[in-house]
Every structure is written in structure tokens, then in C-alpha cells.
């Protein structure tokens, strides 16, 4: 992510940047794991420990602020029971770290975690999966777009 940030931003004049990092950072991986993506929360090591996550977020925020855009951070969605490479509760810890960084910089947080904790099991691709079916993704998109509209102070669509 950090290596690609300048390329992704390019020289575009951004009005708003709504971003998230975290779900892949808190994942535990092990080269011998059988689960997709080498996920293994028992024998694996965390991709990006919380202290490094905080430093990375700080770097990202400082770079994004240089664009002059309004910045919105979307916190990490819920980690359900049974996820092969993620521990329930790590989502909360990483969101706390992110909230501190965003507060230091006056960046609003779009609370996608709170939204996804209300999702019934049928909105997830399968039990123990952090991914959503299209209807779940639609609900996320609705909240994201509402927050962006609010930040841009645009009139709401009827």
C-alpha cells in the first residue's frame, strides 16, 4: 500500500479521499497454512502489528493531506467468529489505533465496523468470512456514499 500510494494519487486534484487499511494488516499468515491466502491465526504471524500499523497510518495520512482533499477514514469491518486468519477483537484494537491517528489529524471516521456488527449472517459470503454478499456490499456503499456527500456538503439525492 505505502509503495503504491504516490502512483495511485498521481497528479489528480482530489476533492475527497475515502480510504481504509486494516483488515489485511491484522491478518495472521503462515506459509504452510491450507486456508486461502495462507491464513492461520494459530501458527501464523500478524501481517502488520498494531505499532507498525499506527506508523503506516501516520505516513498515509500525511501523504493524503498533501493532496488538499477532504479525507475520510473508514474503519475496519467486523471480524466474524471462525475466520481462519483473523482473531475476533483485533478489529476493535486496530480501529482504536486508527481512531487515535485520525483524531490527531482531525480526520472524520466512517464507522463501517458499527454498521457491519448489525449485519445478519446471511449478508456474509459464508460463516467465518470477512467478505460480504452483494446486498451487504450495497449497504456498505450506501453508508460510504452518504458520508462522502455529507463531507462534500452536496445536496442529498431524493
Residue ranges of each PLM-predicted region?
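Alpha-helical cap/lid subdomain in secreted, periplasmic
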Residues: 3-158
Amino acid at each position: 500500500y505505502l509503495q503504491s500510494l504516490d502512483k495511485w494519487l498521481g497528479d489528480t486534484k482530489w476533492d475527497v479521499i475515502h480510504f481504509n487499511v486494516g483488515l489485511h494488516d491484522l491478518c495472521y499468515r503462515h506459509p504452510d497454512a491450507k486456508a486461502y491466502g495462507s491464513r492461520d491465526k494459530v501458527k501464523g504471524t500478524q501481517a502488520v502489528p498494531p505499532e507498525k500499523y499506527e506508523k503506516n497510518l501516520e505516513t498515509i495520512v500525511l501523504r493524503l493531506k498533501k493532496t488538499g482533499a477532504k479525507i475520510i477514514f473508514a474503519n475496519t469491518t467486523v471480524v466474524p467468529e471462525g475466520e481462519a486468519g483473523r482473531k475476533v477483537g483485533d478489529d476493535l484494537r486496530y480501529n482504536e489505533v486508527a481512531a487515535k491517528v485520525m483524531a490527531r489529524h482531525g480526520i472524520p471516521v466512517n464507522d463501517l465496523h458499527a454498521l457491519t456488527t448489525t449485519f445478519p449472517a446471511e449478508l456474509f459470503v459464508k460463516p467465518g468470512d470477512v467478505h460480504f454478499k452483494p446486498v451487504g456490499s450495497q449497504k456498505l456503499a450506501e453508508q460510504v456514499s452518504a458520508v462522502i456527500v455529507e463531507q462534500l456538503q452536496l445536496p442529498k439525492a431524493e
